[in-house]
């Protein structure tokens, strides 16, 4: 469960950062936000590249920003895509979420707006995962 106020803060943050999306190739803007320790929120947008393969998804931008500033534990994730549809994280981003999530029940908020969103648990969108726990 996630507190509704925090959930709405995450959605606001993801919608705001989506404006900075650099996506001239797909024309698909994505914004993401994550909740870390101290109730701090990091956000990020997708950043594409002429080589396509060097593009970075919004979720990973937000996560890498947080980790590189010392926040390694994710308590919640929010993703807001474009057009009136729900945008789910790609496989690579799901794997990166597994690496830093507090646990498998971390809420993943898939939002279109403050009024229209779905909350999943990380484990729902990455069942049968391979993670660092397998290496211990
Ligand atoms: N994208 C994201 O940033 N996050 C997702 O969850 C799905 C896809 C980006 C990658 C690329 O820049 C564009 O959306 C189209 O795939």
Spans of features found by a protein language model:
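C-terminal binding/interaction regions
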Residues: 1-20, 71-136
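Small-residue (primarily alanine) positions within well-ordered alpha-helices
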Residues: 14, 32-33, 62, 66
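Extended beta-strand/beta-hairpin segments
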Residues: 20-26
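Short beta-strand scaffold segments in enzyme catalytic cores
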Residues: 27-36
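Hydrophobic "anchor" residues
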Residues: 40-41, 116
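Compact, glycine-rich, soluble single-domain proteins
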Residues: 46-60
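Short amphipathic alpha-helical face segments that pack within enzyme cores
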Residues: 57, 61, 92-95
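Short, solvent-exposed cationic patches
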Residues: 58-78
